[in-house]
């Protein structure tokens, strides 16, 4: 069933998963809400997600790479002004991967990939 979900829908879900996990990470690290919100926005921008996808490329399984590519190849009618088309496609692939892993219930792998993509308290 999960393997039949298209890349756009996986990315839609993965966007929410990434947003929640980034917020969780930042809240647990402490800080003022206004600061946390600005940092969270930086993490979930297409440019930061594109860089995160590059960091993860060498550690993805074949299955994960296939899901990432399925998301990356989704057709977009518009690209945000703050990202290039290439960045946006990579970000969509990353979101699709996180959506897929969430549906599989593989929270351990999600956390592992998040730690590699966004190590420590580094901001993108």
Locations of regions flagged by a protein language model:
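Double-stranded RNA-binding/processing signature
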Residues: 1-124
């Amino acid at each position: 069933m999960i393997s039949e979900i298209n890349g756009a829908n996986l990315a839609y879900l993965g966007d929410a998963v990434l947003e929640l996990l980034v917020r969780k990470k930042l809240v647990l690290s402490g800080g003022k809400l206004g600061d946390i919100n600005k940092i969270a926005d930086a993490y979930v921008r297409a440019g930061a997600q594109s860089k995160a996808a590059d960091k993860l490329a060498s550690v993805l399984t074949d299955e994960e790479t296939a899901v990432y590519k399925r998301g990356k190849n989704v057709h977009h009618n518009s690209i945000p002004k703050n990202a290039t088309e290439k960045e946006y496609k990579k970000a969509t692939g990353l979101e699709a991967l996180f959506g897929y892993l969430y549906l599989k219930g593989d929270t351990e792998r999600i956390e592992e990939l998040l730690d590699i993509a966004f190590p420590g308290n580094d901001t993108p």
